[in-house]
């Protein structure tokens, strides 16, 4: 059973402000925390409100984090020029463009919503600790969950902006307006501390009705990733091995089964955000029809599968067969009614090994016997018209899964000791991807050769799952990779600059708070 998107009072207030409104109003003056947090139920609702913000288009909903973690690299590009993807995909981003919101997606939207989660999390923590209306056991459980969510948001902020405003106590907005940027190492130190608290106190597994909640293993994988960012390979390996050996998670035998929408809580998935159809929320205002229904374009479930699904007007390759394709889809209860804005890049499609079973889920260039113009990622689309309509999907959003951890363990072991004991981890992932051991077994590589094998294996295994650009940046090879590629519509290979490894702080944030420029007048190189 999915956790329903409960739109609680606190979430409604904190999420309905524009940036300017958010900085002009003090939400705590509208609903005082001391009057809201009167029971464990009240607090649990507030925590669900944090998850609700994470599901916004700016973060895990449509293309929020995808814009920054997958676009502008070597796996994904759009099937046409579009202003949704262009600033990151073509590296034309600047401070002003960072403020331009398209369907609640922009650098600014992501910045605001990550900090909304943090703002709310600080208030929840302040009102739970020592609250006599809540049992001590519930207090600890709630604080662990909220600390994980806050840590996750700060981790994303550091990944995207580096040094950033940082606070862990409730502040009035006048105080927030004058915060400068804290060194990212200082932020990550607190993040790791919060993640370790979460691992001690969060559950390892949840009952069916709570399976959308983050477990201790979600906190563990983020900690492992931070250790790897810092090249603390032993700590990273230790944490990966803890997940592999102690968690209830296991790799599935079939890669395709990982992404089956009818088995969204399978054993490989460490954490996924659950979505439901027909939930009102961030697109409600100004979009409801007279009968209270949503226009079809503004469904408020998970938008993301629609971004990976084809548009019928773009397909098939032989346009004279379009009606026949539509009829074949209809007979299957399907439709090409997506946007096609996230398809496999030319380089990715051209290099994906043809004997790799994963190719069929990542490179779909023929469907129902019709050759297609573009290669699509079927692992993320859902063409089911009745149960997963356009922009209103109930599909969960996979955030972390165990195959990632095996590849992380392989990387850590190789960096520490060379590849001798690392092959077992990468081959564990590859084994299900090929027909024979001769095909899947890697052996005989030196340390650099194994390092390059990891570069490729993470690409094939985790394509479209918000890892690639982050990986290329932490490996220090983003510029080299992008400059060496040919793209369909744009020229990111000539536009990219060294400073593009970080985002600019949006211009409107700088105008409200000039202190943000005191430690770096260049705004991450964009000035």
UniProtKB/Swiss-Prot annotation:
Q: Which domain of life is it from?
A: Bacteria
Lipidation annotated as N-palmitoyl cysteine: which positions? 16
* Coarse class of the protein's main subcellular location: membrane
Keywords in alphabetical order: Cell outer membrane, Lipoprotein, Membrane, Palmitate, Signal
Recorded hits in Pfam families, A to Z, give:
SusD-like_3, SusD_RagB
Question: Which residues, per the entry, are lipid-modified as S-diacylglycerol cysteine?
Answer: 16
Induction notes from the record: By ulvan and rhamnose.
Q: Where is the signal peptide?
A: 1-15
Gene Ontology CC entries for this record? cell outer membrane
Look up and give the membrane topology term.
Lipid-anchor
Any idea where this protein resides? Cell outer membrane
**Protein role:** Polysaccharide-binding protein probably involved in ulvan degradation. Ulvan is the main polysaccharide component of the Ulvales (green seaweed) cell wall. It is composed of disaccharide building blocks comprising 3-sulfated rhamnose (Rha3S) linked to D-glucuronic acid (GlcA), L-iduronic acid (IduA), or D-xylose (Xyl). The SusD-like protein may mediate ulvan oligomer-binding before transport in the periplasm for further degradation.
Q: Which family does it belong to?
A: Belongs to the SusD family.
**What is this protein called in UniProt?**
SusD-like protein P25
- The species is Formosa agariphila (strain DSM 15362 / KCTC 12365 / LMG 23005 / KMM 3901 / M-2Alg 35-1)
